[in-house]
């Protein structure tokens, strides 16, 4: 089987501005956000602590865009999974311009809000949006990932939880 490659981007960072929301002619929502990721290290030559911040353009589509517009604000911590795409366009003077973005949409797109409540009163949704649990943690259906908090606070109709546990084939005769 020939491999075509993998185009997957995972980011955890903070929003640089409030999301910009617009709607396409078909009514679908589009949200543009900018996520800052930072790394720090100690400079070996000077011993100084150094930090570098990288800014990432992210575009969300559909229900994820609506959720981002309603609950994310500047400074919000967020986890996103998407694909890297480069667009080519022409500016007013006719020059070709390029813009590289992380596109979050469809089956491969994931957005999870992290951290506590934002200043604007948006509920913390990090723990409620786990798509897959680890060993001993429940696996929740993917569609719950997109539910707004109002829907989650309704009558507790939870699907029966399935647990993803490792097989229990321990050998008690191990000498250590």
UniProtKB/Swiss-Prot annotation:
Residues 6-111 form the SSB domain. Keywords: DNA damage, DNA recombination, DNA repair, DNA replication, DNA-binding. A motif (Important for interaction with partner proteins) lies at residues 171-176. Pfam families: SSB (PF00436). Residues 114-176 are annotated as: Disordered. GO terms for cellular component: nucleoid. CDD domains: SSB_OBF. InterPro entries: NA-bd_OB-fold, Primosome_PriB/ssb, ssDNA-bd. Residues 120-162 have a biased composition (Low complexity). Homotetramer. Plays an important role in DNA replication, recombination and repair. Binds to ssDNA and to an array of partner proteins to recruit them to their sites of action during DNA metabolism. This is Single-stranded DNA-binding protein.
């Amino acid at each position: 089987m020939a491999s075509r490659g993998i185009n997957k981007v995972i980011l955890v960072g903070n929003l640089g501005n409030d999301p910009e929301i617009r709607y396409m002619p078909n009514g679908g929502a589009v949200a543009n956000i900018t996520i800052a990721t930072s790394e720090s290290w100690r400079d070996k030559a000077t011993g100084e602590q150094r930090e570098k911040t990288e800014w990432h353009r992210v575009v969300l589509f559909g229900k994820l865009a609506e959720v981002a517009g309603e609950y994310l604000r500047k400074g919000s911590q967020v986890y996103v999974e998407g694909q890297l795409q480069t667009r080519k366009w022409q500016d007013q003077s006719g020059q070709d311009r390029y813009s590289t973005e992380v596109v979050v949409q469809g089956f491969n797109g994931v957005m999870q809000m992290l951290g506590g409540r934002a200043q604007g009163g948006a509920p913390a949704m990090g723990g409620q949006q786990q798509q897959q649990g680890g060993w001993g943690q429940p696996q929740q259906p993917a569609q719950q990932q997109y539910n707004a908090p109002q829907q989650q606070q309704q009558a507790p109709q939870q699907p029966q939880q399935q647990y993803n546990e490792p097989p229990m084939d321990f050998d008690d005769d191990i000498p250590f």
